[in-house]
């Protein structure tokens, strides 16, 4: 059997097993990581939005 076919077969089997798991109301761990990452990105965006006018004003003075 070709290695590529074996790899694809194993990959499909893993995806089927992971796709059938249900965690009820609680989010799956992979989605929790995504939510945490999204929250970090939102915090960085908000901090940059607040800090950039201050930095621009400081550079204009100096």
Curated annotation (Swiss-Prot):
CC annotations in GO: extracellular space
Alphabetical UniProt keywords: Antibiotic, Antimicrobial, Immunity, Innate immunity, Secreted, Signal
Signal peptide per UniProt: 1-19
Keyword Ribonucleoprotein part of the UniProt annotation: no
A single GO BP: defense response to Gram-positive bacterium
Subcellular location: Secreted
Similarity comment: family membership: Belongs to the cecropin family.
Miscellaneous remark of the record: Protects mice against Escherichia coli and Pseudomonas aeruginosa infection.
PANTHER family: CECROPIN-A1-RELATED (PTHR38329:SF1)
Role of this protein: Putative antimicrobial peptide. Partially neutralizes lipopolysaccharides (LPS). Exhibits anti-inflammatory properties: inhibits LPS-induced iNOS/NOS2 transcription, nitric oxide (NO) and pro-inflammatory cytokine production in mouse macrophages and human peripheral blood mononuclear cells (PBMCs); inhibits LPS-induced activation of MAPK and NF-kappa-B signaling pathways in mouse macrophages.
Protein name: Cecropin-N
Organism of provenance: Aedes aegypti (Yellowfever mosquito)
């Amino acid at each position: 059997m070709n290695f590529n076919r074996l790899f694809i077969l194993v990959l499909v089997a893993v995806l089927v097993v992971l796709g059938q798991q249900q965690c009820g109301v609680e989010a799956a761990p992979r989605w929790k990581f995504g939510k945490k990452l999204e929250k970090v990105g939102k915090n960085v965006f908000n901090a940059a939005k607040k800090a950039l006018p201050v930095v621009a004003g400081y550079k204009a003075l100096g």
